[in-house]
Curated annotation (Swiss-Prot):
The keyword Repeat applies. Interacts with fbf-1. Residues 1-32, 513-533 are annotated as: Disordered. This is Cytoplasmic polyadenylation element-binding protein 1.
Length: 585
């Protein structure tokens, strides 16, 4: 025990004890037993055994080790910039025996290796900085994906196959069904056209890029697990539901409540089994301007969390939507379907189809639609039905005879706007004067703006085309005191020459599908317009511009003031004419 303590440096050794230790070491070689093996001596410490063993090995290789003459005080020295140093550690081998062993070379190589001493004059190599490796390791550990269990060689052999019949068996785990290139680095998901095909009693998932050329071959992925995460009872119920030959839904379906970390392949398999479908992920702005690409993985993980958990499905055939709706569970007026992710098992996601019967609303079977009593409402929430919008307007302004939701002509999906026709002129005037309405549907509650519906191909209401050579009227006055279409001459005569009560009215024009309010008639030059308008009206325009800069004006005022600066400086070379647009109900 005394020799072990001395070897570990825990006891200060005297000179007499050192001489006794050398004698005992020499005597132990003579008293050793066991066929001349010196390591069987009872008074030989473990340190001496390792020293003797390493000494023989080093002498055989010819690589003697000389101990470092540096003291521990060097480790605490302050170095220059970009130089590295180490924190001083306590040396457990501080006795004289160990110092003599270092001088003689009778120590293992690791214990006798000279300490690395950076130069005080030279800059250190940047490759010695281990900070970047630490950050990259943390980023890799935090990435939200798992390695694919199948080998890369088998995957490449599968993708290189020319025919589906020649593809060998290839299994995928439930959470990883696609190759490693499907893992998102920047958090952006890619749109894919998905279709499930059966060939030779084997199921394959066909993936294609909607923006790729016709010559681009789709990707085939074999399926070795059930098609979808839907309960078998729901699948059996789908077959029992009556199928309508008439279209009932739009081919575009909204899926909400998706888990943030749901794999793309899980969405492909779940919804691709109902038919050929385009998976349309919502688009998010790219995050550019990063200082370095070192944090690419970490930034991708953050962006992935910020993506909303919803997706749009565009099926090729309408009957696929009926199958999807029949497979859902109906609860509290909503459709739900189960979907799994690495962190959530069988989560209920909302399936929101759009019924074609919700596009129009008629108060009576035979109702007359008067365009002169029609208003345009933009920013309508997409789930809002025509009957819901009619109910909201009737509570505020009066009876509504017709409501039409603007839809995409191909997909028949809402575009976020509507046209409403009131039953009486009084209700129409009240709606124009009120300008806003609160639309409530399910969990949505939004305040939208009401504007007169401006039509194309309308003659002037004052001259009926006699003073403008029977050209269509380019302006519409949406003020409650006018509500008429005007040609250029009648606009000046009714708003400036007949009196100043209407001089502050602003013309409304139809531009495509939008209705815009202009700050002045476009056929007036800036100087001519400012000369005819009174000073108090010009002051009022300055106040409007001031309020719009503060962000307190309406949507229409912001549009007008945004374009006023360029329009005042530019004199049109020819009379203004509205852009042609089709009109119909």
């Amino acid at each position: 025990m005394q020799h072990q303590l001395k070897a570990c440096g825990d006891v200060k050794t005297s000179s007499r004890a050192q001489q006794n230790h050398r004698r005992s070491t020499a005597a132990s070689a003579k008293r050793s037993v066991g066929a001349g093996n010196s390591f069987l001596a009872t008074d030989v410490t473990n340190l001496e055994m390792n020293s003797n063993f390493m000494t023989r090995k080093l002498k055989k290789n010819g690589n003697g080790v000389i101990g470092s003459p540096l003291s521990n005080g060097y480790f605490g020295a302050q170095l220059t910039a970009n130089s590295f140093n180490y924190t001083p550690q306590a040396n457990p081998y501080s006795n004289l025996d160990f110092q003599m062993a270092m001088g003689s070379g009778d120590v293992p190589s690791l214990m006798g290796m000279p300490v690395h001493k950076p130069s005080m004059m030279l800059q250190s190599d940047p490759s010695m900085d281990l900070t970047q490796f630490t950050e990259e390791l943390q980023a890799i550990q935090n990435m939200p994906f798992q390695p694919i269990s199948s080998s890369q060689a088998a995957l490449q052999a599968f993708l290189a196959a020319n025919e589906a019949a020649s593809i060998g068996s290839y299994g995928f785990s439930k959470s990883q069904m696609l190759p490693s290139n499907s893992m998102r680095v920047s958090g952006a998901r890619k749109n894919r056209i998905v279709e499930v095909k059966n060939q030779n009693d084997r199921l394959f998932l066909v993936l294609s890029d909607p923006q790729a050329s016709v010559s681009t071959r789709p990707t085939l992925v074999p399926l070795t697990r059930p098609l979808q995460s839907v309960a078998q009872s729901c699948l059996d119920l789908t077959k029992k539901q009556p199928f309508s030959t008439e279209p009932l839904y739009s081919r575009k379906v909204f899926i909400g409540g998706l888990p943030i970390d749901v794999p793309d392949e899980e969405v492909y398999v779940t919804f691709g089994s109902f038919g050929k479908v385009l998976i349309d992920w919502p688009r998010r702005p790219e995050h550019n301007g990063r200082a370095s690409d070192m944090y690419e993985s970490e930034m991708g993980r953050r962006n992935l969390r910020s993506v909303s958990g919803y997706v749009f499905l565009v099926f090729t055939h309408e009957d696929s939507v009926q199958d999807l709706v029949n497979a859902c569970e109906f609860y509290d007026g909503k459709y739900y379907l189960q979907l799994s992710s690495p962190t959530m098992q069988d989560k209920a996601v909302q399936v929101r189809p759009w019924r074609l019967s919700d596009i129009d609303y008629f108060s009576e079977e035979k109702v007359t639609v008067d365009p002169r009593r029609t208003v345009f409402i933009g920013g309508v929430p997409r789930p809002t039905r025509a009957c819901d919008l009619a109910r909201s307007l009737q509570d505020y302004y009066g009876k509504v005879s017709y409501v039409g939701i603007d839809i995409d002509p191909e997909l028949k999906y809402p575009k976020g706007a509507a046209r409403v026709t009131f039953a009486t002129a009084q209700s129409f005037v009240r709606a124009i004067s009120g300008r806003f309405v609160q639309v409530t549907h399910a969990e949505t509650n939004k305040r939208v703006e009401i504007k007169p519906y401006v039509m194309e191909d309308q003659y002037c209401d004052e001259c009926e085309g006699d003073l403008c050579k029977h050209n269509y009227a380019p302006y519409y006055c949406g003020d409650s005191s006018c509500l008429q279409y005007y040609c250029e001459g009648c606009w000046d005569r009714m708003h400036y020459e007949m009196g100043q009560s209407r001089a502050d009215h602003r013309p409304m024009v139809r531009t495509g599908d939008q209705t815009r309010i202009l700050p002045r008639p476009p056929h007036h030059p800036a100087a001519h317009h400012s000369h005819q308008r009174p000073q108090y009206l010009l002051h009022q325009d300055q106040l409007d511009n001031h309020h719009s800069s503060r962000g307190n004006s309406s949507v229409i005022s912001r549009i007008v003031n945004r374009n006023s600066a360029t329009m005042l400086d530019h004199v049109p070379g020819k009379p203004f004419s509205a852009i042609s647009a089709s009109y119909g109900y």
